[in-house]
Swiss-Prot record:
This is Probable acetolactate synthase small subunit. Stimulates activity of the acetolactate synthase catalytic subunit ilv1. It comes from Schizosaccharomyces pombe (strain 972 / ATCC 24843) (Fission yeast). Keywords: Amino-acid biosynthesis, Branched-chain amino acid biosynthesis, Cytoplasm, Phosphoprotein. The modification Phosphoserine is found at residue 34. Disulfide bonds: none annotated. It holds the Pfam family ACT_AHAS_ss. GO terms for cellular component: acetolactate synthase complex; cytoplasm; mitochondrial nucleoid. Belongs to the acetolactate synthase small subunit family. The keyword Zinc does not apply. It is found in: Cytoplasm.
Length: 289
């Protein structure tokens, strides 16, 4: 009886197609005595101790190779011949690639300052520093790595005003002379049109380069009909960014002086904090106990 009744209700449910208000009652009557199937629980496999240790070893990442750290040395040396060769020989013997080396005189007579920027491991750099200090002509070696300092580098860059399409014209002088002789045989009207197009090209190129130089607080050192020389004094990273932005315009020549560094003066708040730490408190003002 119950199965026959369920069959009738099922046929009625099919005819209604879940549009009637009594469709939920029909559904509950059909599925009242049918329990929902239980989800099968799959237990994870239990690994043994050797398998667990092997899994941990295989999943542990390897130690990444540390990049060579950037070191900045400031050497105070005697102003005499042969000091630079002895110092560079020590660095070359240990395989250092010197990023920058600047030598200049100081305000003191017979005293020069060398600013060296190199990359290498801390232990190897420390050994090279001690060997440099052992040179007779070296007064002191100051390590500015990790300290608050001011770094500046001067850049002179010659950029083309003809655009990237005419970049090779600066290196092909013979073809340029031949083209200029052939251009004289052309009509005056065609020559005026080419001159106007070249003038507009130079003006747009000059405006874009000048705007970029202004954003980096640089200045124009020299300008001609085909090239412009830019001057920028900034940090080494800022100079690298400026050069990368100038490359699409066509950099003909670039000259960098190298890094000059000088430590910053301590701030007033740092001095006061150190002074407060050194103040001794009298026992009278201490709490009891």
């Amino acid at each position: 009886m119950f199965a026959r009744r369920c069959g009738r209700l099922a046929n009625r449910f099919v005819r209604l197609k879940s549009t009637s208000a009594t469709s939920p009652i029909t559904y509950k009557a059909l599925h009242a005595n049918s329990p929902l199937p239980r989800c099968r629980i799959i237990e994870p496999p239990r690994a043994t101790v050797p398998e667990a240790v092997s899994n941990i070893i295989m999943s542990t990442p390897f130690n990444r190779v540390q990049r060579p750290k950037r070191h900045v040395f400031n050497c105070l040396v005697q102003n005499e011949p042969g000091v630079l060769s002895r110092l560079s020989g020590i660095l070359a013997a240990r395989g250092f690639n010197i990023d920058s080396l600047v030598v200049c005189a100081t305000e003191v007579e017979n005293l020069s300052r060398m600013t060296i920027v190199l990359r290498g491991a801390d232990e190897v750099v420390e050994q090279a520093k001690r060997q440099i200090e052992d040179i007779v002509s070296v007064w002191a070696v100051l390590d500015y790595t990790g300290t608050s300092m001011v770094e500046r580098e001067l850049l002179l860059a010659k950029v083309s005003l003809l655009g990237p399409d005419h970049f090779q014209e600066h290196f092909e002088r013979s073809e340029k002379v031949a083209e200029s002789t052939n251009a004289k045989a052309k009509s005056d009207g065609e020559g005026v049109m080419n001159a106007n197009a070249a003038l507009q090209l130079r003006a747009s190129q000059l405006a874009a380069i000048n705007q970029l130089t202004t954003l980096f607080h640089g200045r124009v050192a020299d300008i001609s009909t085909e090239t412009i020389i830019l001057e920028l004094t900034a940090t080494p990273d800022r100079v690298d960014n400026f050069l990368s932005l100038l490359r699409p315009y066509g950099v003909l020549e670039a000259c960098r002086t190298g890094t000059s560094a000088m430590t910053r003066a301590p701030h007033s708040n740092e001095v006061t904090e150190e002074a407060e730490d050194d103040v001794e408190v009298e026992e009278v003002f201490l709490p009891p106990g």
